[in-house]
From Swiss-Prot:
InterPro entries: Phage_tape_meas. It comes from Streptomyces phage phiC31. It comes from the Viruses. The lineage of its organism: Viruses, Duplodnaviria, Heunggongvirae, Uroviricota, Caudoviricetes. GO terms for biological process: viral tail assembly. Keywords: Coiled coil, Viral release from host cell, Viral tail assembly. Residues 9-35 form a coiled coil. Serves as a base for tail tube protein polymerization and acts as a template for tail length determination. This is Probable tape measure protein. Belongs to the P2likevirus tape measure protein family.
Length: 729
């Protein structure tokens, strides 16, 4: 009947395996990050160059359209284009087209001084855009209003007009967002009653602060006053007479305009404020200011030309100050910086690259007929070229990459298979050696995985380079489409395909040589690892000398078996002769039986005790010898192992002793020794230390392995007992 035998096996290499797995994952993660960064950088560069070319072409076309719209000379058009570029680079507008639109408005309204440089023009453009931003309007309406202010005498120059508009908006004159329209519509009327821009803006601000609906209502009231008083008449004269003024003189002053008319307006408003009776005052106001006075009501009495300018406060420099305030922030400065870089690229392409390409235009046109012929050939054989291009794109390149990667994977599989077969032999020889074979196998497998991850990174770089080349080709094709004739593009593409087809054998041959060189290099590395494993590790030495070890072990067990057999035969012969001796001494049978039983029992006890001691000593001696030999090899490997594998960021840091020694199984120990039952722990033990194994402690844990045998334990016991009894020990 088969009986179970319990065996406790000690071994733990999880920590080393996890450490190496983490290192492999870090290498792989770095490869993915490097690939992502390289792809992002390559894409950004390609997009930037493509956008620069497109913008250079667009800017040149926009400048030509602007010059045609303004009728500017080539020199003037150049200065205007440079000014527009500077304005955009400084962070103004959403595009160069916006700058061109602002420039057109200023030019058409006469706001660009004759002979102004690009810098001067740029300064005017920037102010126009700043004022438009303050007013919440577009540059076009702002330029129109400023131009009208200059034509009607509201301002001496564009800078003064900009200051007046900005200061008026800051004082609330643009309450209903009609300030630009008001100056554009009523500028002539303001001039007719002797008002300049500052005074007119001050009156608008006073009326709005007094309760007027909007700037248009205040301006319309002033317009009606000028028309009514200039026409004169009995009602006008009577109204002035009620205020103690001469109507005829007032009519003459308003008709004269200028400062005299302004003074007449001032006296009229002062006279209205002196009338105590509200009914009489409103009736007089309606007579002189028309029905708008009914809408203005008391707001009309707030108008005072003599203090209007003071109401605005400081006007000069208002536009410049507002612009500096708007652009004194990080966002605007960053925008200006990036646009400056972009404009530099565009200027280089438009001013250097495109003119050089223009010089090649005649030569390219000379080969137009040849390109047309080639284009016809391609058209006739389009199917063939499509097949070749499809094979190159869809089959060949992926196949080459897959072949290279698969070769590396196959190499890794071969090594893993070899290590697995070696580990199997180690398992059958000794369980302790199996644990360390797994450690070594895990180490090598991690190294193979790191190599595969590195190969993936390289493949990513290759793919990134291919994608960058493809994007570059697309950009170049778009560039040529925008500048050159279509046959030239067709010829370039056809030429590329023809070159690939014509030199395909060379390309394939060189590619195979490169991959063959890589494969030979990989095989050399793994051959070196195989030699190292067989000659410098405990499991490797067991594998290499397995036949000798097995033969010696077999001879030893045969000797033990023969010895046990002879002993059992002696026991049998003794038992056969025992009855005769018992019958001849019947009188002392009982005492003799007792003595014989006692002798047998004591002999078995002593024999079993000696057998146990012998087995324990034998196991201990073998274990110490094996552990010492393997630990010696492990010390050599730990000494020879570097602290870091790889170069730079593609490196893996290794611990000082990556391969732990055999776990302490009891007995003398010294140096770094791995102990611990629930988890591996490395401790440094001084000479003369003794380790007591867990299985020797009460309640110690372990792994129970059930081993079945068909041998008869009672027969084995009888033979062992007889052998021990008759042995000389």
């Amino acid at each position: 009947m088969a009986r179970p035998i319990q065996i406790t096996i000690m071994g733990d290499a999880d920590q080393l395996s996890e450490t190496l797995d983490q290192a492999s994952e870090e290498v792989s993660a770095f490869g993915e990050q490097a690939k992502g960064l390289a792809l992002a950088a390559g894409g950004a560069i390609a997009v930037g160059i493509g956008a620069g070319i497109a913008e250079a072409l667009e800017r040149e076309a926009g400048n030509d359209v602007l010059a045609a719209q303004l009728g500017a000379t080539p020199a003037e058009a150049k200065r205007l284009g440079e000014a527009a570029g500077e304005v955009y680079s400084a962070g103004y507008g959403e595009s160069v087209a916006d700058a061109n639109e602002a420039l057109k408005g200023l030019w058409q309204q006469g706001l660009v001084p004759a002979g102004a440089t690009a810098d001067d023009n740029g300064e005017h453009f920037e102010k126009a855009m700043d004022v438009a931003t303050v007013l919440g309007d577009e540059v076009g309406p702002t330029s129109n209003a400023v131009g009208q202010m200059l034509k009607t005498g509201m301002a001496k120059n564009a800078d003064e007009a900009f200051d007046i508009l900005v200061r008026g908006a800051q004082e609330g004159a643009n309450k209903s967002e009609d300030l630009l329209d008001t100056f554009n519509e009523y500028g002539v009327q303001f001039k007719g009653i002797g008002l300049d821009g500052k005074t007119a803006m001050g009156l608008l601000s006073q009326g709005l602060q007094g309760g007027a609906r909007d700037a248009d209502l205040v301006a319309d009231s002033l317009k009606e006053f000028g028309l009514i008083v200039r026409a004169g008449g009995d009602e006008v004269n009577a109204a002035y007479k009620s205020m103690g003024l001469n109507g005829a003189e007032m009519t003459k002053a308003i008709a004269q305009g200028g400062p005299v008319a302004k003074d007449a307006l001032d006296k009229t408003l002062d006279g209205l404020r002196k009338i105590k009776d509200p009914a009489e005052r409103i009736a007089t106001a309606v007579t002189l200011f028309g029905t708008q006075a009914e809408d203005m009501q008391d707001a009309l009495l707030k108008l005072d030309p003599s203090s209007a300018v003071e109401t605005l406060g400081k006007v000069d420099g208002a536009a410049k100050s507002a612009g500096e305030t708007m652009h004194d922030n990080a966002a605007t400065k960053i925008k200006a910086f990036t646009r400056g870089l972009q404009t530099g690229l565009v200027d280089f392409i438009g001013g250097t690259v495109l003119p050089i390409l223009e010089k090649f235009k005649p030569a390219l046109e000379g080969i137009g007929s040849t390109m047309a012929t080639v284009g016809g050939f391609v058209s006739e054989h389009s199917t063939t070229f499509k097949v070749v291009a499809g094979i190159i794109t869809a089959v060949l390149l992926p196949a080459l990459i897959q072949w290279g990667v698969q070769s590396t994977i196959n190499a890794g599989k071969a090594v893993v298979a070899w290590v697995t077969s070696s580990a199997t032999a180690v398992i059958e020889s000794t369980k302790q050696a199996l644990a360390h074979a797994k450690v070594v196998a895990g180490w090598i497998a991690s190294g193979v995985q790191a190599g595969l991850n590195a190969a993936k990174v390289v493949a990513g770089w290759v793919l990134m380079g291919a994608q960058s080349m493809i994007q570059g080709a697309r950009m170049a094709a778009a560039w040529l489409l925008a500048m050159g004739p279509i046959p030239l593009i067709i010829a370039a593409i056809v030429g590329l395909v023809v070159l690939i087809v014509a030199n395909w054998d060379k390309i394939w041959a060189y590619t195979k040589k490169v991959f063959q060189w890589l494969w030979d290099w990989v095989k050399k590395i793994f051959n070196w690892l195989e030699d190292l494993f067989l000659n410098f590790t405990g499991p490797g030495l067991l594998i290499k000398h397995w036949d000798k070890s097995r033969s010696a072990t077999k001879n030893t067990f045969n000797n033990v078996k023969n010895f046990a057999k002879d002993a059992l035969n002696a026991v049998v012969n003794f038992v056969k002769g025992l009855p005769g001796r018992i019958l001849s001494a019947a009188s002392s049978l009982l005492s003799a039986g007792k003595r014989i039983g006692g002798y047998v029992i004591d002999g078995i006890k002593n024999g079993l005790s000696k057998l146990g001691g012998f087995a324990s000593s034998l196991a201990s001696a073998v274990g110490r010898a094996a552990k010492g030999a393997i630990n010696g090899v492990i010390d050599l490997l730990n000494w020879a192992t570097p602290n870091k594998l790889g170069w730079g960021k593609l490196s893996i840091d290794l611990p000082d002793n990556p391969i732990p020694k055999i776990r302490a199984m009891g007995g003398p120990a010294s140096g770094w020794t791995r102990v611990g039952e629930r988890g591996p722990e490395d401790v440094f033990l001084p000479n003369g230390s003794t380790v007591r194994p867990n299985h020797a402690l009460s309640g110690s844990g372990g792994v129970t392995v059930n081993v079945q045998t068909n041998a008869d334990p009672f027969a084995i016991g009888r033979e062992v007992a007889w052998a021990l009894r008759t042995s000389p020990a």
